[in-house]
Amino acid sequence: MPDLTTPEVKKLLAFRGYGNPSGRFWFVGMEEGGGDFESLQIRADEFANLEDIATSHAKFESHDMSKSISTWRIMSAIVGRISGTENWWETACTTNYQMNRLGRLNDETYLTEILPLPKRSLSDWPYGNFFDSPKSYFEQIFPAQLASLRLEYSESKSKPEFVFCYGKKYWPFHKKIFESIDFESALDDRILWGQNHSTIFVLTNFFGYGWTGFGENFVEKLCQFVLSKS
């Protein structure tokens, strides 16, 4: 881990996400990947609280927005299918959206996380100088993050039409953010969903291909279901 100062860690903790909170689509994960030395120091030195995903990640020498990344590809496919884009599942289509529109400040998507500090993996813990353990970090940070995300939703200039919270392990925390929503299961218990007067909320597995099941057929079923409720 880089020798981050306390003010730098506080800056990392204040990070909100990528894109437009007033956009049509929200994607809410648990925590962002990428807690290596390079990315942490760049984030601490150069990131604002809200970033454009393409311009901010261009600061990482190791990153390439033209490379198809499973999580972002599935986000792009969901947006494409709901928006009626032709060939929405094809890699060329999702990569083009990923490169040019996903997580852009003045566009239609907002990518945020329950926890603000990035990690390379679930077992990785590069913040031992500031938090005793991941459990201690969660207990200290989650209440403020919970309040922040609730406020961000309530104060968004126009409410998102669709909020996708991904990572089944974290459904209880996603449900706490949107505690006024009555969620029910659908698609053979593979999702939870609910809605208010302006937004459809969907809780899913993690956005990946293998056991999480986000192939073309499931994304088609998911989007058909969501569109039937809108």
Predicted regions, residues:
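C-terminal capping/extension of enzyme domains
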Residues: M1-T6, F131-R150, K169-S230
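A short helix->loop->beta-strand "cap" motif at the edges of active sites that frequently abuts
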Residues: G23, S158-E161, Q195-I200
